[in-house]
Amino acid sequence: MKILGIESSCDETAAAVVEDGNKILSNIVATQIPFHKMYNGVVPEIASRKHTEWILPVVKQALAEAGLSLKEIDGIAATGRPGLMGSLLVGLTFAKTLAWSSNKPFIAVNHMLGHLYASHLENDIPYPYLGLLVSGGHSIICKVNNFDDIEVLGTTIDDAPGEAFDKVAKFYNLGYPGGAVIDKLAKSGNPKAANFPMPIIHKEGHKYDVSYSGLKTAVINQIDQFWNKDFEKTPENIAAAFQTRAVKILLRPLLDASIDTGLKTIVAGGGVAANSLLREKLAEHKELKCIFPSLKFCTDNAAMIAGLGYHYLKRGDRTPFTVEASARVEGFSKKGRQ
């Protein structure tokens, strides 16, 4: 089955054609970073307008690169949740209209499950495994039983790691996007320049949860309190000290979950999965098999949406054209199909 995937949940307008869940025939991503860089963050109104402008040429390019006409497409998948409402509406409405007018099967999928599926585009990964979803809006540690069946073990109780990276980068004028900039700066800095605090939340059912509000506050508002006076307060040192603590906050509950569940395969997804220190630290655990998507599949893309959509459509699932976009995902903290 050849599936056309469409993704527009935030600030990337993307379309891809994927055959049988993992054979990528095309993968087009039009990024809006230059339009949001001056604001050090995504402006929803600008994002939705750019999606409206770009969605048709991006889809046409995806079909052309795949060497296929719309008639040769077996189904259409699009992100339906979660994300920025204005952005989601553009891609979802376009996909529904295209599917209806061409009489193609249609499925709306969960963007976060798409990120979790991204590694399947390049690897044959048996279920179950331990999933790590880390992005600007989410931090989820979960047991993955199937492509649509996950059991959430832990999540963030306040801020997501990607949001912390972005806020720290914005406060210190390090650049945009924050995650990539901090990762690059940290390579030239000393992680011992500051000893930022670890959150103490791993009690009373929070063993696998994470918290980033305290770290964010410490780096932005209380940096002198935790700074090592032997080091100069440079952007590189700030980035290195912050990133080291941010990654450690993730690793502790993740490794605990691996021990407690007995799952030795960890599959990561989401924008923060591109972080080089996170990859490096997990690679040190030789007892684990840690699988990361290629960097191009960590950021938002439509190949993961098409790949995931294939499994729903193959099973016979269909989404009615009355489906509406949703900025949030209800029940994502509970066990069950998503």
Curated annotation (Swiss-Prot):
GO terms for cellular component: cytoplasm. It catalyses: L-threonylcarbamoyladenylate + adenosine(37) in tRNA = N(6)-L-threonylcarbamoyladenosine(37) in tRNA + AMP + H(+). Substrate binds at residues 133-137, 166, 179, 183, 275. It comes from the Bacteria. Its cofactor is Fe(2+). Pfam families: TsaD. Required for the formation of a threonylcarbamoyl group on adenosine at position 37 (t(6)A37) in tRNAs that read codons beginning with adenine. Is involved in the transfer of the threonylcarbamoyl moiety of threonylcarbamoyl-AMP (TC-AMP) to the N6 group of A37, together with TsaE and TsaB. TsaD likely plays a direct catalytic role in this reaction. Belongs to the KAE1 / TsaD family. This is tRNA N6-adenosine threonylcarbamoyltransferase. It comes from Treponema denticola (strain ATCC 35405 / DSM 14222 / CIP 103919 / JCM 8153 / KCTC 15104).
